[in-house]
Swiss-Prot record:
Residues 140-149 have a biased composition (Low complexity). Phosphorylated on tyrosine residue(s) by the thrombopoietin receptor (TPOR), stem cell factor receptor (SCFR), and T-cell and B-cell antigen receptors, gp130, IL-2R and IL-3R. Phosphorylated upon stimulation of TNFRSF11A/RANK by TNFSF11/RANKL. Phosphorylated upon EGF stimulation. Phosphorylated on tyrosine residues by HCK upon IL6 signaling. Dephosphorylated by PTPN11. Residues 159-169, 556-577, 589-611, 656-670 have a biased composition (Polar residues). Belongs to the GAB family. This is GRB2-associated-binding protein 2. One of its GO terms (molecular function) is transmembrane receptor protein tyrosine kinase adaptor activity. The SH3-binding motifs mediate interaction with SHC1 and GRB2. Residues 127-178, 341-430, 492-531, 556-643, 656-676 are annotated as: Disordered.
Amino acid sequence: MSGGGDVVCTGWLRKSPPEKKLRRYAWKKRWFILRSGRMSGDPDVLEYYKNDHSKKPLRIINLNFCEQVDAGLTFNKKELQDSFVFDIKTSERTFYLVAETEEDMNKWVQSICQICGFNQAEESTDSLRNVSSAGHGPRSSPAELSSSSQHLLRERKSSAPSHSSQPTLFTFEPPVSNHMQPTLSTSAPQEYLYLHQCISRRAENARSASFSQGTRASFLMRSDTAVQKLAQGNGHCVNGISGQVHGFYSLPKPSRHNTEFRDSTYDLPRSLASHGHTKGSLTGSETDNEDVYTFKTPSNTLCREFGDLLVDNMDVPATPLSAYQIPRTFTLDKNHNAMTVATPGDSAIAPPPRPPKPSQAETPRWGSPQQRPPISENSRSVAATIPRRNTLPAMDNSRLHRASSCETYEYPQRGGESAGRSAESMSDGVGSFLPGKMIVGRSDSTNSEDNYVPMNPGSSTLLAMERAGDNSQSVYIPMSPGAHHFDSLGYPSTTLPVHRGPSRGSEIQPPPVNRNLKPDRKAKPTPLDLRNNTVIDELPFKSPITKSWSRANHTFNSSSSQYCRPISTQSITSTDSGDSEENYVPMQNPVSASPVPSGTNSPAPKKSTGSVDYLALDFQPSSPSPHRKPSTSSVTSDEKVDYVQVDKEKTQALQNTMQEWTDVRQSSEPSKGAKL
């Protein structure tokens, strides 16, 4: 055993071969000794031997150049999948070591981190010892989880209403939602507590209610007027129950609920039916006769329940005659925000109960929603509620977009009607955007576009500009943000089809473009990339339980500068093979810095004496010192580098010297031949 330093830790570890040889070489078991040189003045090293009786180490790892230590790595290699792997990253190489037990790994990691000065060693090793327990289950009890989720829910409600959709994450599981109800009722206004009391009586809808109570709490609380109007239902919580009854999961199953609940659940704008029970307006049978309860309707009801699309798609999939349901939708939105009595007469005040004549739809001012322009009052409320759509989750937006596009698909005949009569209007642009089906000239096209708008971050500001302008114009919300911007600025809508059609085509084109790129990937470089990936996969990689410790940058720089010289001498003692190459390269720094040779760099001139003498001739005409450093690199490289780096005078002088040598040799050789 080689001495030098106090022994801190010893034991058997399996060592990885170099990264480039992981596929060909085996992981061999070696005897490791960790030595600390603080007391003796020697460097801190980690040595490994062939066995515990060997006297000469196979390699000495200088820990002064240790940059990082990772514990708890994961390895895909079969024989090492369940092993305890940690690594030591140095400036030269990364050593992957495998311990037999987790305690051994923690012991080695803690010792190495203490020697290297990693302050995080103690608390990280403590956390490493608890890795198994942390991986099997959460440490907090369900009560703590519920309390924390309640706290987050309360904060998000009060401070960040724009993210109020996030509390739904805590209400997917019934146990958490049961704990949340008292907290929600205490933190929410009194009106919302009343809704909770109503929904608590519905045991069969617990799953839907558990989700929607968080969503409805978060989204309805953003509109105080909406909550107040819901609470003014004279004891009827139908509207509140409707949102909580269907949630996300009970939407396709309206048959489970009563007529009241179905009306309010599947057609919230039409839930005038629910308001009608209270205010004496629309009846449930009226909405039932319209076959409203299609599968696509619930997603739009979900948007309305979020306080966004209170006036949009709900009536579109009801029947092919969905145009005359829009007045009721807008009338409900007016009732929902202003609590006016929504009677069939009120709906007739806006557009007639039947689809408007083609002459109304030809107004190029409002574009595709030909039925909506007369409802400037109701469209005002739409514009007021639509900007909230930006706070919807992306998942909800995608659902709404899919549902609304399906709704539009059901009415191609209306697309044909409006395609002929609105060639110069915005519906032509919509028709080019969704060919053959989207030119619905009414809320069909508008609803699918409304569902797509939440994905545009700037839609809120554009909608604000629309509200400042024409109210009926704000009803139409195109899917494309560029076209929407032109519409809000009042530009002629006839120019939009040119932009909208190609833009949609460009969105469809990327798959073919990607397919065209695939043949290039199948070229010769592909196997090389796959080979590189396999090599990377064969390396241990970090997992969620991996803990890392690294040295501070300034500490490492100071240590590296302090121990810059020992690395060359260290490599001499580490291995016999390749010592001359390892020593020859770093020893050039002393040669270039000072002409005085040292004892360690003496072997270098012996091996390449001719090249050194030849370069010495190149140094003579050069007075400034900066030119010497580039020339020293030519000791191990080709002489052409010197000709590129030196100036013309140096090059000419060197050529003259070479010519003189050749002349002398040529003149001396014939004379020798003559003497012979």
